[in-house]
């Protein structure tokens, strides 16, 4: 059992009783799913290993059935020429460790996470070349320890919803600090013990909205940079520079843990790539008056107001917590703002030295009963892959793009109410029949039989593998060529992108 299970039980009434016991049933249908990838002409699949499925008590004996499942899945992918991309943690800490010492709030988690990662590297690293330690560490820390909206549901009033335990002023910073230390420890282990033999790469993932000033006022511009520092710099600054942003240290003060000198040196550069989950841009308005509050949480420390457009008559975006959680943050479709993705990549180029980046998630939320024609999702996919091409023209070191999600699956916050999938799952059918949506009409390419398999391709000098510019020969449009799954029951489309050689600026 993991901490996600407890969350699903608590929110069952708000998700029509949905749980993840079966979801899209990839555990039993992995061969069918891999065949669907083959039929679609895809090249890579990213999935999470469930820590509690592999090591039920968090440490100690390995579950042979869990080990066999992941070996079966990886082998099935490899035998079909499909790259496995693996994430080690997706909000699914074993409940035993949460109960024993408080999970991510305790430094013991660094030791146990590293031991778990060691098992994964040892058992699967001969075939898995791409490792992501943590999915959305920033969101997990805030949702799990500030709002109570994600496992393990820690929060304190007035900053969360239905708070029964936790401290929203301190715990998000403490949990996030331990996440960074655990990532650093696992990455160091991989680089020292496995990388030379297995020739793989390791990184970490975070959520990254693009923030835009609501007005031309100086205070809104300052607030926008503050929002970037709190959400993005919280992780990117230590990973690139070895310490937290100055504005975070000034505002959070002693509530923000400090890195020891050795820790700072070790976290700095502890990645081969960064994974970004991007969905849309947000407009930022300054609200520095929040900083006068005697007790603050992560969001009052940010001291901003957030909206999805410059129309102030619209309901503000629920960036922190909502009275009717999770319903009112899961309604309607995301605004399609492809240019914001381009701006985000440009920001990483300028602020963080242009590190190798994978867009690990990007997608369109629709209601589950929406049309299979799925025009909004098609428009979103075209727009965002086009923006990625523009970012490449401007020198971005982006390496790949993942579309959330491949299948309609259980969403952690609203069960099966939302539909992100490129393929529809009939949950009323006992066999979970799949139906294609309009995305299948998009142009796409597959490798010819003469091309090398993905895991045989030569790595480029950056050590990440073929760059977007080098990977395909496509005439000006995105090539949809691979699949990602960010949890055992979830999958998303992954596409490497390369424009036609005739397009200027991408020689």
Residue spans of the language-model regions?
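Active-site region of glycoside hydrolase catalytic domains
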Residues: 1-13, 38, 57-59, 67-458, ...
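Aromatic- and Gly/Pro-rich amphipathic surface segment
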Residues: 2-35
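Catalytic domains of carbohydrate-active enzymes, especially glycoside hydrolases
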Residues: 29-50, 351
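Glycine-rich, proline-tolerant flexible connector loops at the mouths of alpha/beta enzymes
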Residues: 49-62
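Residue-identity detector for glycine
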Residues: 463-465, 476, 505
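Aromatic (phenylalanine/tyrosine) cluster motif
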Residues: 494-496
């Amino acid at each position: 059992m993991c901490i996600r299970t407890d969350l699903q039980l608590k929110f069952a009434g708000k998700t029509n009783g949905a749980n993840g016991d079966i979801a899209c049933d990839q555990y039993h249908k992995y061969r069918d799913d891999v065949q669907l990838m083959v039929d679609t002409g895809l090249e890579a699949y990213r999935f999470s290993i469930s820590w509690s499925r592999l090591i039920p008590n968090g440490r100690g004996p390995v579950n042979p059935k869990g080990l066999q499942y992941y070996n079966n899945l990886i082998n099935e992918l490899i035998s079909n020429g499909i790259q496995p991309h693996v994430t080690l943690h997706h909000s699914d800490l074993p409940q035993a460790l949460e109960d024993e010492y408080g999970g991510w709030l305790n430094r013991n988690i660094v030791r146990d996470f590293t031991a778990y990662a060691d098992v994964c590297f040892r058992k699967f690293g001969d075939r898995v070349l791409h490792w992501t330690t943590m999915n959305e560490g920033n969101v997990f820390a805030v949702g799990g320890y500030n709002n109570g909206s994600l496992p393990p549901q820690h929060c304190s009033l007035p900053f969360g919803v239905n708070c029964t335990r936790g401290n929203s002023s301190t715990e998000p910073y403490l949990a996030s600090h331990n996440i960074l230390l655990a990532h650093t420890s696992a990455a160091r282990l991989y680089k020292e013990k496995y990388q030379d033999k297995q020739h793989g790469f390791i990184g970490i993932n975070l959520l990254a909205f693009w923030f835009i000033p609501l007005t031309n006022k100086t205070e809104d511009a300052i607030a926008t940079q503050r929002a970037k520092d709190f959400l993005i710099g919280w992780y990117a600054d230590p990973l690139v520079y070895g310490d937290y942003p100055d504005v975070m240290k000034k505002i959070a003060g002693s509530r923000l843990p400090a890195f020891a000198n050795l820790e700072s040196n070790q976290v700095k550069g502890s990645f081969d790539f960064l994974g970004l989950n991007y969905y849309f841009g947000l407009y930022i308005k300054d609200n520095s008056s929040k900083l006068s509050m005697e007790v603050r949480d992560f969001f009052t420390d940010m001291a901003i107001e957030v909206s999805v457009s410059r129309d102030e008559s619209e309901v503000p975006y629920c960036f922190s917590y909502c009275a009717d959680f999770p319903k009112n943050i899961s309604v309607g479709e995301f605004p399609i703002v492809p240019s914001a993705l381009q701006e985000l990549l440009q920001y990483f180029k300028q602020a963080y030295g242009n590190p190798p980046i994978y867009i690990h998630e990007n997608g369109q939320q629709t209601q589950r009963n929406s049309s299979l024609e799925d025009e909004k999702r098609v428009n979103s996919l075209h727009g965002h892959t086009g923006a990625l091409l523009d970012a490449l023209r401007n020198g971005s070191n982006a390496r790949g793009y993942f579309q959330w999600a491949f299948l309609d699956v259980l969403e952690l916050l609203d069960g099966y109410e939302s539909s992100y999938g490129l393929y529809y799952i009939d949950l009323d059918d006992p066999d979970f029949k799949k139906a294609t949506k309009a995305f299948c009409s998009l142009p796409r390419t597959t490798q010819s039989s003469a091309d090398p398999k993905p895991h045989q391709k030569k790595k480029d000098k950056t050590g990440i593998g073929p760059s977007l510019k080098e990977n395909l020969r496509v005439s000006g449009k995105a090539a949809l060529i691979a699949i990602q799954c960010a949890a055992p029951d979830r999958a998303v489309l992954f596409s490497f992108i390369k424009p036609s050689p005739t397009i200027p600026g991408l020689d």
